[in-house]
Amino acid sequence: MPDYINFHSRNFLIRKFISLVIKILVFFPDWLFCLVWNLILLMINNSVRISLIKDGRFLVKDKIQSMEIVHKKRFEFYLQNISTRLNHISYEYMLDSVKFSPGDTIIDCGANIGELYLAIDQNYQAEFKYYGFEPAPKEFSALNNNTRNLVEKPLALSSNTENRNFYIRTKTADSSFEEGKNQKKIHVECMTIDDYFKEIKSITLLKL
């Protein structure tokens, strides 16, 4: 269990139980996964809820906000609340070291579901121009919904402008151009940063 998940109760047995549940429930059908998790979270007085959208996409809600995620294995990162997860993203990417100003340009290569965008939007409240690149179809759909349709189309950044094979592994969010085990192959459009951003003179943050 990620160490930043801190349930309302610190009881050791409850934490061990939740850890076991996380490992077991991912094998349940999507609808049953949501039902059982919501019952458990209700019993431990946790406000987080999860519902199935379709095709392996889920909506996570807490008392304050909601966001779309892909693959139920990723739900464990939101078990305290969405804000805590986004704070962890800010810490992982050391966003406190970036001086954000109005009009900044942020490029998110491999944006997945848009957690970087949401973390900056939540913690820094700066007006910025966001460009997210995500070629995987399900992740792109969630990205587009989470960023309020800021991303125009599924696209990958690469060293050449071309079409390439792309290997998806949604469960662990480590899809790439390199073929690996248990990955789905798709064909994606790729562009270089120079080709895509011909008129942009300054980039505040580039996440690769």
Language model features: what each stretch is:
Residues 1-133, 138-145, 198:
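S-adenosyl-L-methionine
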Residues 202-207:
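Short SAM/SAH-binding signature in class I
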Residues 111, 157-158, 208:
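Short, surface-exposed acidic/glycine-rich loop or hinge patches that mediate macromolecular interfaces
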Residues 65-95, 153-201:
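Glycine-rich adenosyl-binding loop in Rossmann-like folds that engage adenosine-containing cofactors
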